Amino acid sequence: MSKVVVLNDKLEKAGELDLPSKYAEVNPHNLYLYVKSYLASLRANTAHTKGRSDVSGGGKKPWRQKGRGGARAGSTRTNVWVGGAVAFGPTNERNYFQKVNKKQKRLAFERALADKAAKGALFTADSLAIESGKTKDANAVIKKLGVKDVLIVKDLLDEKTLLAYRNLANCYVVDVAEVNAYLVSVFNAVIMEKSALESITKEG
C-alpha cells in the first residue's frame, strides 16, 4: 500500500498515512493521456506558413508549355519555387486540444499520487505557511526536506506564502484547487498540508 510520510512542525518524520489502495490500481495509461493532453493545451498555434491559395502572385504562366527545352511551369508560386508557397507547413488554424474526460482526469491524479507515495516522495504537514513572507524562510523549509525540487500544495494559498516561495527555482507552490496530475508527476517530491490531502482523498 502507498504511504504518505507525515511530518511534524520541525519537518521531521513523525509517522505514515495510507493512501486509498485503489490509487495504485489505476491504469497508468490514464496518467499518460492526461499529461499528453495538458502539454498539448500549453502549445500556442503561432507558427504559420502560406499555402498555394494564400501566397500572392503567380497567376500568369511564366512561359509557354512547349518548345523551350526546359521543364514546364504553370505558376511561379508553387512550393518548388523560391518565394512560392509552402507544402504541408504549419498554420495558425490548428487546434491542439485533446479531450480528457473528468473521470479520467481524476484517475490520472490518483495514479500520480500513488506513484509519488510508492517512491516515499509524498509528504504531509499540518501547516506550510510562511508568515514572514521571506524567501530565506521558505528556502530553509526546502533544505529541511532534503529534496532536489518540490511541489508545495496549500489548502488556502495566502499571499505571503506565495511571495516567499515564488523566487525559488526548485519549488512551486499551488492551491489545492489548482493542483493536477502533471504538476504532481513533474516534481521529485510533493508536500501537502494535511487539510489539503484530506480534501483530495475525500473527493476520491
From Swiss-Prot:
This is Large ribosomal subunit protein uL4. GO terms for molecular function: rRNA binding; structural constituent of ribosome. The gene is rplD. One of the primary rRNA binding proteins, this protein initially binds near the 5'-end of the 23S rRNA. It is important during the early stages of 50S assembly. It makes multiple contacts with different domains of the 23S rRNA in the assembled 50S subunit and ribosome. One of its GO terms (cellular component) is ribosome. Part of the 50S ribosomal subunit. Keywords: Ribonucleoprotein, Ribosomal protein, RNA-binding, rRNA-binding. It holds the Pfam family Ribosomal_L4. The lineage of its organism: Bacteria, Pseudomonadati, Campylobacterota, Epsilonproteobacteria, Campylobacterales. It comes from Campylobacter jejuni subsp. doylei (strain ATCC BAA-1458 / RM4099 / 269.97).
